[in-house]
Structures are given as structure tokens and as C-alpha cells.
Amino acid sequence: MLKTKLLSRYYFGSLDEKAAYKVYCLEKNAKHLLEARELKVKWKPTDNTKPVAVMKRVLATNQLVLAIKSKCSSYKSDIIKKVLVADKENELKANAFITLAQGITKIDVAVEAIRREKNWEEKLLARLNLYKNFFDTFKPGTEGMNEKPYILFVCEDKKHMAEVYKVMVMNNIDLEGRVYFTYDLLQMEPSLENTWHQFIHEDQKIKLQPLNIELLK
């Protein structure tokens, strides 16, 4: 498939790492093949030349979406790069937007994959401020949403979840308790029902609490 330009292969690694890993991306002939089968394809050649941090966010997002699609009977739909705020000055697109529904219970989840890239805390704070503005100005019907979505931060590991939450606390970012946390390896679990977490304040301490979410069964 590499020779026929259906896929291209890239390596992620650095001088101080003993291992690298491979990433396979769509190529132009694969796009033509899929379109010939009347499948909608948004791929562009520039998608394969994005910065490493961007590609890692895409991979983390895709891993989470695929895990939910394959393991959760409540999965209804997903939109990649869903527009939450269309205003040019405050434009906000979620990495992914997932709808889960079972019976009369339905939630929308905006997915934010966070990577420890250069200046990642500053970049995260900028995103958090966009989400806060979105929550503060939200009206039913905004971009097709009747209620504010939950935000799911996909972190690199357990420690990273605490680092992300610290940025929120230190900058007084209040997202109305509609925030969940998870990390990459948890998407490999056979069941996802205990893979989302929240930070709770108890006895003057902040604790990380795994949640038992029926919609993730």
C-alpha cells in the first residue's frame, strides 16, 4: 500500500529516545479510491505535514473515538473538529464531538486531547478561556446544541490529568463541573465505564475520583 500511494508512513522519535513509533496516514490514491465508493473524505495533502504535536493530538482523539464506537452501546455519533463557536475572533472547534444516548439519557461530549508539547500550559489556558467564553455565552440552539456539552480532556497519563487540572485551578477557570478527564492507556481497557475521572474537593484536599458511567458500558 505504500508503493501504490494508498498510505504513507512516518516515524515519531527524538535523539534522547531509545524507541520510535510508526504512523500511517492516508495518501491521495486512497482518497480517490474511497471517493469512488461514494465515501466522504476530508483528507488533504497538508494533513500529512502538520507539526508532530498536532498529529499526536489527532492520534489520541482518534483512539478515544474508536474505543467508544467499538465498546459502548450508547454511542450515537461523532463529529471531528465540531464547530462550537463560529465567531472568527473566538472560533472554537472541539477535537471531536461525541453523542452518547441510552433511553431518555443523552449527553454530548467535546473532546480535547492535550499533549505535553512546548508551552503546552499556555496553549491549554488559551483553549480553556475559549471554552469559558463558550459556556458564558451559550444559548440553546447554538450550533445545533440544546444543552452545554461536557468536556473530556484526553491526557497523556495519570499525572498529566493533575497537571491539566492545576492549570484550571490556578487560573480560576470554572466550567460548571462539566469536565471529565481520561488518558491514553485507559482506552485499551475492555470496558470504558470506569475510565473517566473528576477532581473533587473533600476535607480541604483535592482528590481524583474515577466515575462509574452507565453510558460507557
List where the protein language model places each region.
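Nuclease-adjacent, charged terminal/linker segments that flank catalytic cores
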Residues: 1-48
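Electrostatic, structured charged patches in enzyme active sites and in nucleic-acid/phosphate-binding
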Residues: 48-217
